[in-house]
Structure formats: structure tokens, C-alpha cells
């Protein structure tokens, strides 16, 4: 008579299961720490870039606001004057770029929060949205001023607008410098938007 064989399955010890779970959690913590470190680095660069953009935008608005030149002709009673307030495009530039600079100052606390809490989504998302809106304002101001600067340098033969930069050299140099500074600020904003997009993508 054949004997029946009995097979007994012995499960893994609970200590092995707990050990595996501990290893998985540890790897998760290490990955999270590495991701947080990378995001903190992006946040620090974001903060420094905002400081630089503040300086550039304040400089652009100040240079445009103080752009003025007076040319005497024949007598001191007959003078020709050129100033930023003579052209609506330059007035818009000063107001718009001043708003951009104010926004950048107000955005610094949110940038600091992303340094302290690099994994936080809300402040980074807020910065991304408002950076996108403000760079549009900055771009429109720079484009409007750049068109007038071009006319000041080259004129327009079709409308008989003569270039004035040969006479008002200092004025044209100041407004051109302001437009270049505003264009640099646009590049800063593009980098800031890319930083925020990368930080959010890592989530």
C-alpha cells in the first residue's frame, strides 16, 4: 500500500517581509530627498534671477523716465525739446515696466517659499501663472517703445517722418538703452517660466 506524501508550504518569515518593506521605504525617502534637492537648487536660481530682473526693470523704467534733451536754436527763447512724456508709447513703457518691477518685488516671498519647501506645488504654480501674464505686459511695452525708437533712428520716408537721433543723440541713446534693458528682462522671464515648468513637471 503506497504511502501518501504531505507537502507543507512554509511562508516567508515576517522579518523578511518587514525588511523588504523597510528597504522600499528607504529608497523612496532617498528619491524624494534627491528630488527635493534638485528643486531647491532651481528655486535658489529662480530667486537670484528675480533679483537681477528687479534691477534691470527698475533701471529700464528710470532711464526712460529721465530721458530728456533740449536743443537751443538761435536764441534761448527758441528751443526744441524731446522727452519721454512727448510720446504715449514711452509713457506706457514707463508705467508698464514699473508694474513689472513691482510684481517682481512682490514675487520674492513666493520664491523664498519654494526654497524652504521645494516640494510645494501651489507657490510654484502661482509664480508660473503670474510670470506668464507679466512677461506679456513687459513684451508689449518693449515692442511699443522699440517701434518709436526705430522711427527716431531711421524715420519714415512714406510719411515724411524725419529721423531725430542726429539732433537728439543723448535722448535716443537713453531710450534705446531702456528698450534693451526691457528686452533683457523678457529673457529673464522666459528662463523663470522654464524653471517653474521643470519644477512642476518633476511632480
Curated annotation (Swiss-Prot):
Q: Where in the cell is it found?
A: Cell membrane
> What Gene Ontology molecular function terms does this protein carry?
protein homodimerization activity
Carrying N-acetylalanine, the residues are 2
Q: What are the GO BP annotations of this UniProt entry?
A: cell wall modification; cell-cell junction assembly
Q: Which family does it belong to?
A: Belongs to the Casparian strip membrane proteins (CASP) family.
One of this protein's Pfam families, by short name?
A: CASP_dom
Does this entry carry the keyword Phosphoprotein?
A: no
Q: Which residues lie on this side of the membrane: Cytoplasmic?
A: 2-40, 114-124, 199-203
What exactly does this protein do?
Regulates membrane-cell wall junctions and localized cell wall deposition. Required for establishment of the Casparian strip membrane domain (CSD) and the subsequent formation of Casparian strips, a cell wall modification of the root endodermis that determines an apoplastic barrier between the intraorganismal apoplasm and the extraorganismal apoplasm and prevents lateral diffusion.
Q: Does the keyword Acetylation apply?
A: yes
One GO term describing the cellular component: plasma membrane
Ranges facing Extracellular side: 62-92, 146-177
User: Which residues are noted as glycosylation sites?
Assistant: 156, 174
Q: Give me the segments passing through the membrane.
A: 41-61, 93-113, 125-145, 178-198
What are the top taxonomic ranks of the organism? Eukaryota, Viridiplantae, Streptophyta, Embryophyta, Tracheophyta
Q: What is this protein called?
A: Casparian strip membrane protein 1
Spell out the subunit comment: Homodimer and heterodimers.
Amino acid at each position: 500500500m503506497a504511502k501518501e506524501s504531505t507537502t507543507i508550504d512554509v511562508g516567508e518569515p515576517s522579518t523578511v517581509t518587514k525588511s523588504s518593506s523597510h528597504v522600499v521605504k528607504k529608497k523612496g525617502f532617498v528619491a524624494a530627498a534627491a528630488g527635493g534637492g534638485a528643486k531647491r537648487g532651481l528655486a535658489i536660481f529662480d530667486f537670484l534671477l528675480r533679483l537681477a530682473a528687479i534691477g534691470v526693470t527698475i533701471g529700464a523704467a528710470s532711464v526712460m523716465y529721465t530721458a530728456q534733451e533740449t536743443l537751443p536754436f538761435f536764441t534761448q527763447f527758441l528751443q526744441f525739446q524731446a522727452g519721454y512724456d512727448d510720446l504715449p508709447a514711452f509713457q506706457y513703457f514707463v508705467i508698464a515696466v514699473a508694474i513689472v518691477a513691482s510684481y517682481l518685488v512682490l514675487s520674492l516671498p513666493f520664491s523664498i517659499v519654494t526654497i524652504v519647501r521645494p516640494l510645494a506645488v501651489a507657490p510654484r504654480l502661482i509664480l508660473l501663472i503670474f510670470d506668464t501674464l507679466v512677461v506679456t505686459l513687459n513684451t508689449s511695452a518693449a515692442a511699443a517703445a522699440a517701434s518709436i525708437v526705430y522711427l527716431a533712428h531711421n524715420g519714415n520716408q512714406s510719411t515724411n517722418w524725419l529721423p531725430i537721433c542726429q539732433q537728439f543723440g543723448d535722448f535716443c541713446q537713453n531710450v534705446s538703452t531702456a528698450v534693451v534693458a526691457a528686452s533683457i528682462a523678457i529673457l529673464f522671464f522666459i528662463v523663470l517660466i522654464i524653471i517653474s515648468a521643470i519644477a512642476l513637471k518633476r511632480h
